[in-house]
């Protein structure tokens, strides 16, 4: 196989020598180089067993207008070459392909099924894709990914590596089950807890919790009497009743006398206010010329006539002040005239 033609078609611009997909160390963040480039889908048909150059020729005939359509073998090889810096030489790639084609044991085919269930292709292609699946598809446990990637260059047999990856996946699936059970159980418990708090805080129609029964003062008094029997000589019930019997008529008589005094004072003040108001209206009626001779006049009529008379007085006052100013000016003119006559 010759992958140089594929590399020329994969890069965007070879003339400008823009090395977007240079090989980097595994410790660096390689995903930054592939953020804007979509991944290549793995075809289900696979590539033919012996024609390694047919897929490269077909890929070159597509042109830049259509996206690159790669088979399962080519996509896996390119992804491993570009992403993980593996299979950088042609000899190592051919060696691996020949090993997979020659050693097609049933153990390898059995381990391929849990990893790639949906892919159906030839045995040689399946072996190469199975070799690349632990590198392209990350396992659920992140600690196991560097182990599978580092085992490519150090391990002697690739079949053991595939078995380890499948066992790790099964273990990870088995370990996820209790986690999902606990996660499903937590929200229900929290919801019930919040509902109970909400009902306790906002259920205003509910009855209050029963309060502790407070002891009556009579019961407390009996308890104190029982504790100190030597100090009490007479029954306590008769002491407050004996002075209240003779004092009850005196208290009622004093309250009645206070009410009578308040009523008398109120009546006196009310009569005084009415007499003062009547005398004021009579004086106002005497001041109004049109009502001075009438003996019985309603208060409303007295007020209306008084306001009219007051407005008339205001107008007369304004007229008199204007006339006064005119007379004062005339007086000043006469004084000047007298002074002029004396000067001659």
UniProtKB/Swiss-Prot annotation:
Q: Where is the sequence biased in composition, kind Basic and acidic residues?
A: 259-270
Residues annotated as domain bHLH = 261-313
The answer on whether this UniProt entry bears the keyword DNA-binding reads yes
InterPro entries recorded for this chain? bHLH_dom, HLH_DNA-bd_sf, Myc_transcription_factors, Tscrpt_reg_Myc, Tscrpt_reg_Myc_N
DNA-binding as UniProt keyword: yes
Expressing tissues: High levels in oocytes, modest levels in kidney and low levels in spleen.
- Superkingdom field: Eukaryota
Tell me which Gene3D superfamilies the record gives. Helix-loop-helix DNA-binding domain
Q: Where in the cell is it found?
A: Nucleus
Which ranges of the sequence are coiled-coil? none
Enumerate the transmembrane spans.
none
MF terms (GO), sorted A to Z: DNA-binding transcription factor activity, RNA polymerase II-specific; protein dimerization activity; RNA polymerase II cis-regulatory region sequence-specific DNA binding
Which portions of the sequence form the region Disordered? 104-162, 208-271
* Any one of the GO BP annotations: regulation of transcription by RNA polymerase II
Please report any disulfide bonds recorded for this protein chain, giving both cysteine positions.
Answer: none
Q: Which UniProt keywords apply?
A: DNA-binding, Nucleus, Phosphoprotein
Question: Which portions of the chain have biased composition (kind: Polar residues)?
Answer: 104-113, 213-223
* Region span, Leucine-zipper: 313-341
GO CC entries: nucleus
Kindly state the subunit structure of this protein: Efficient DNA binding requires dimerization with another bHLH protein. Binds DNA as a heterodimer with MAX.
PANTHER family reported in the protein's UniProt record: MYC PROTO-ONCOGENE
* Full protein name: Protein L-Myc-1-B
Which species is this UniProt entry from? Xenopus laevis (African clawed frog)
Give the gene symbol.
mycl1-b
